[in-house]
Amino acid sequence: MTYLTTWTADARPRLLEETTDPARIAAVLAAIAVRFERWPLAPGLPAGAEAEDILAAYRSRIDALSAAEGFVLVDVAALHPSAAADWREVAAAARARFLAEHTHDDDEIRFFAAGSGVFYLHVDERVQAVRCEAGDLISVPKGTTHWFDMGVEPDFAAVRFFRAEDGWVGAFTGSDIATRIPDFDALARRSSSAAQPQAEAPAAAS
């Protein structure tokens, strides 16, 4: 499930809020001009589906969004666990690419067709860490300081929308804030714990 945590953006970040409620997540993100919505998952797509199959499965929604927002290029970024000898090296390099805080000269729009990844949005002395899951669409406005973590074992497929071929190039801020906020894997463990049902307290003795 989609999971949002809010942290202070100081030397010792503190957790201010956590939620899995889609309406609350959308409201928190809307307050910082970040678009968040859910698309129905396309039936029949197998695990590890090819890019062309993902694009075909969501073609009507992709075309509608592209026409409305002026996107000229759409592709699929995907990485899944593999038995290849160099997979961990490839995964680590892919993860490191946007793991530090940066901005873009264009909006960053991603639709997760499979798997998950965490966008960290640093706005107004807060960091909103939103773990996007399959079916989530997120649009980060240009100029927003943020970073993205796919975890130590990436497993996701995301449709990317661009208004220009070079719009995804990152301008890094030099801040080390990304090292102070829990990463993808720490948040995954935290959300799993939060989702566990709590045992009922024993009845008080009469």
Curated annotation (Swiss-Prot):
Catalysed conversion reaction: 1,2-dihydroxy-5-(methylsulfanyl)pent-1-en-3-one + O2 = 3-(methylsulfanyl)propanoate + CO + formate + 2 H(+); 1,2-dihydroxy-5-(methylsulfanyl)pent-1-en-3-one + O2 = 4-methylsulfanyl-2-oxobutanoate + formate + 2 H(+)
Binding site for Fe(2+): H102, H104, E108, H146
Record site feature (May play a role in transmitting local conformational changes), residues: D107
Required cofactor names: Fe(2+); Ni(2+)
Superkingdom: Bacteria
Pathway as given in its UniProt record: Amino-acid biosynthesis; L-methionine biosynthesis via salvage pathway; L-methionine from S-methyl-5-thio-alpha-D-ribose 1-phosphate: step 5/6
Site (Important to generate the dianion) residue list: R110
GO terms of molecular function: acireductone dioxygenase (Ni2+-requiring) activity; acireductone dioxygenase [iron(II)-requiring] activity; iron ion binding; nickel cation binding
EC number(s) from the headed UniProt entry: 1.13.11.54, 1.13.11.53
PANTHER family in UniProt: ACIREDUCTONE DIOXYGENASE
Homology family: Belongs to the acireductone dioxygenase (ARD) family.
Protein name: Acireductone dioxygenase
Organism: Frankia alni (strain DSM 45986 / CECT 9034 / ACN14a)
